[in-house]
Amino acid sequence: MNLKDPICAIATPPGKGAIGVVRLSGEGALEIAARVWRGKDPRRLKGGRFALGEVVDPKTGEAIDQAILLVFRAPRSYTGEDLVEFQTHGSPAVLRRVMEVLVAEGARPAGRGEFTFRAYLNGKMDLAQAEAVLALIEAEGELARRQALRALEGALSRRIEALENRLLNLLAHIQALLDYPEEGVEPLEAERTIREVLAEVEALLAQAKASRLAQKGARLALIGAPNAGKSSLLNALLGYERALVSPIPGTTRDYLEAPLELFGIPLVAVDTAGVRETEDPVERMGVERALGIAEEADLVLYVVDRSQPKPAPPPLPWARTLKVATKSDLPPAWEDPEFLPVSSLTGEGLDRLKEAVREALLGREGGEVLLTERQVEALLRARERLEEALSLPEDLMGLALEEAARALALLTGKEVAEEVVARVFQNFCVGK
């Protein structure tokens, strides 16, 4: 693949729309654009300027559509190359035809993520920022959007670069001590530096779960005895009536799912059948399914009616379970500080419960860092090498520190295999 030749792609989603965008980038992009454009010559436009005209078939002179043409000149463009965008009406037929004439004039259809790949190769962004582009495109919740934008703006890259520089400075100092002991080079507190870098790596890894949940979403299971108030609590969390509520125990015989966003996290809240001992085979199936849902959930709300005697707890994954005492507006039959009191009727305790859900899913840091699986692997490798370095004397820790610095460099793509880069960009859409 020639990474200088002109490429083109439809940059807007498939289907009909008010506006469609076709991108053209690479050597000769302005010349190709001039041949398919009737209006002000794109070659005469300054970067960041636009013109109104028509996209035409240069072989027949036939107009394809009225359009706006935008010119971005190298290196001040997304790709770092000369780049042209045609903004047409969002008709699939129009967009296909524009692509046809561009290809006929010498451009080739872009591969997946090739525009962003060229931006990476031309130094417009590092690999962590390129991954942030994809995360921003795919973001479904507000937290994922914030994470991706911060990474795209370089927040993670700057943090990693600072750690990498600390290790490289330490390596240089250790090497100077070994090579020129007679010069009296001041010894550096290597252990303290390594522990500080290790603490930063640990802090990043602590946010890996939050990053995954922000990007992929989480499942929240409501588990409890019949008539414990699970359906009412679900409706209160949603802010509208989704689940059927009845004073008759056992109203919910199967599970019910509803989408919910809390603190920017896309959740699927699952209201389950009441968990109790029963001879009814249908209800028993519902109970078994409820317990299975709890095992697979990212977080469980164990819901108990505080106005009634406390039941024996069911088998639940307690490490990721919050205990909720419902009907707190009624006189209590028991008190337990491990339970969060909530009234679905008055709303008392709902904000505290939501905050507890946020902290259980995201931790105290709040999950503002975007980390991909590839980046987490690199951080784990860096942590392993830093821990190894701590167990070695100064004159032997150099190799472990070099490998730790190299692992950190993988995050931003400074030292990364070609196949890894290809794997990152194969998940992109064609027009990006």
From Swiss-Prot:
Residues 217-362 form the TrmE-type G domain. K(+) binds at N227, S246, I248, T251. It comes from the Bacteria. Its cofactor is K(+). Binds 1 potassium ion per subunit. Its EC number is 3.6.-.-. Coiled coil: none annotated. One of its GO terms (cellular component) is cytosol. Mg(2+) binds at S231, T252. One of its GO terms (biological process) is tRNA methylation. GTP binds at residues 227-232, 246-252, 271-274. One of its GO terms (molecular function) is metal ion binding. It is found in: Cytoplasm. (6S)-5-formyl-5,6,7,8-tetrahydrofolate binds at R23, E85, K124, K432. Keywords: Cytoplasm, GTP-binding, Hydrolase, Magnesium, Metal-binding, Nucleotide-binding, Potassium, tRNA processing. PROSITE patterns: G_TRME. Exhibits a very high intrinsic GTPase hydrolysis rate. Involved in the addition of a carboxymethylaminomethyl (cmnm) group at the wobble position (U34) of certain tRNAs, forming tRNA-cmnm(5)s(2)U34. Homodimer. Heterotetramer of two MnmE and two MnmG subunits. Belongs to the TRAFAC class TrmE-Era-EngA-EngB-Septin-like GTPase superfamily. TrmE GTPase family. This is tRNA modification GTPase MnmE. It comes from Thermus thermophilus (strain ATCC 27634 / DSM 579 / HB8).
